[in-house]
Curated annotation (Swiss-Prot):
GO terms for molecular function: calcium ion binding. The lineage of its organism: Eukaryota, Metazoa, Chordata, Craniata, Vertebrata. PROSITE patterns: EF_HAND_2. It comes from Homo sapiens (Human). Residues 63-98 form the EF-hand domain. This is EF-hand calcium-binding domain-containing protein 10. InterPro entries: DD_EFCAB10 (IPR049760), EF-hand-dom_pair (IPR011992), EF_EFCAB10_C (IPR056587), EF_hand_dom (IPR002048), EFC10 (IPR039879).
Length: 127
């Protein structure tokens, strides 16, 4: 019984402090940029996150609008201007903006570029 209580406390702690999202973001940024000195790069990112949190200034994420558009266009190989919900969810996971256990609701509509950009930008601000 004690183990499950500890596991529950650990899970609550990780969720409360958004640790999974931060680790996922750090991993995505590391793989996106592939810096020569990964440990120094991660320390720098964490410091910038801390400064952004303390000052209330938006953190400059690695995904600007041109990157978001490029990612969308790769998924929209047919050029229809939409992607499927599955592609959308996988893109959010790849970017570290969605956890495995997050329950995203599929409303049955295709995802447009504007919707994709809006959601990616919104979620990046929440990190």
């Amino acid at each position: 019984m004690e183990t499950s209580s500890r596991e529950l406390q650990a899970a609550e702690y990780l969720e409360k402090h958004q640790i999974k999202e931060v680790v996922s973001y750090l991993t995505s940024a590391l793989l996106f940029f592939r810096p020569e000195k990964p440990k120094e790069y991660l320390i720098s990112l964490l410091e910038r996150l801390r400064i952004a949190k303390v000052t209330g200034v938006a953190f400059p994420f690695f995904m600007d609008n041109s990157n978001i558009v490029a990612m969308f266009e790769m998924m929209d190989s047919s050029g229809r201007g939409t992607i499927s919900f599955v592609q959308y969810k996988e893109a959010l996971k790849t970017l570290g903006l969605c956890t495995e256990d997050e329950d995203l609701q599929d409303d049955g509509h295709k995802i447009t570029l504007d919707k994709f950009k809006e959601e990616v930008n919104k979620r990046m601000k929440e990190i």
